[in-house]
From Swiss-Prot:
GO terms for cellular component: cytoplasm. This is Oxygen-dependent coproporphyrinogen-III oxidase. The record marks 180 as: Important for dimerization. Keywords: Cytoplasm, Heme biosynthesis, Metal-binding, Oxidoreductase, Porphyrin biosynthesis. The gene is hemF. It catalyses: coproporphyrinogen III + O2 + 2 H(+) = protoporphyrinogen IX + 2 CO2 + 2 H2O.
Amino acid sequence: MRKDRQNKITEVGIYLKDLQNRLCRAFEKEEGESRFQETLWEKPNGGGGRTRLLTEGHVIEQGGVNFSCVYGNQLPPAATQKHPEISGFAFQAEGLSLVIHPRNPYVPTVHANFRFFIAGKDEADPRWWFGGGYDLTPYYGFEEDCRHWHRVAKKACDRFGEAIYPRFKAACDDYFYLKHRNEPRGIGGLFFDDLNEWEFKRCFEFIKILGDSFLEAYLPIMQNRKNHPYGERQREFQLYRRGRYVEFNLLYDRGTRFGLEFGGRTESILMSLPPRVVWRPNWEPEPGSEEARLYEDYLVRRNWVSVSGA
């Protein structure tokens, strides 16, 4: 059983590191000259990771694509919130986390995460599961972008059954929600936890299909919007809306909590935060403006796959 457990860890790690390489190459191609800077880190008796960060780029103001492989004698509370029966279990976990904060306000911020856990009190019967997904946070909405994003996500999910996309889409809408603001973080995507309902091979295949679909979902949006003209008004609104991103990640995000509770590398964990942000107390958008449309037409639950258009 120990060999089988290690084989799973090795197999998932190989894929996630390869995906990290492919994602970084794709974003560097969009940038032209800027490159991700790599930092290797280790936690004594706890694993380590490979952090890649791109800052002050032409297209990407700040973006991180991180891989980590960690282990410990006890799962942090963030990993056992829904399943207290496994608290106290020794564990191994691998994950890839991506957050891109573009410079142009018309390019949405994007987040993706793919992770694998294996835990148990002994080697005889370890419990394993996958989690992750991806979600999109626009500042200025375009229906064709939202439709494309969700259709790619649905196409990836449909290979595993037509019930998968609506289930994980709804979970994403539920998870990325700021309760204290009574609004979603963005237009959603896919989110899932505790995926082990199929055999390991099929669950892992789902992760790979989803990971491989990410660039198809996001790059065309970035390419179409990165040269869109904008001014100070759009930039200020982008910085204001980034505040919601900060609030969610620090108040609600379980991945952030897991990393901090585990004692991982803080700089890598907080790479999800934007480099610049503003808060404006009691600010409201001008009625009928592009900014108001974000709240009225995009920060609402919608069946984006069925939105009319070519």
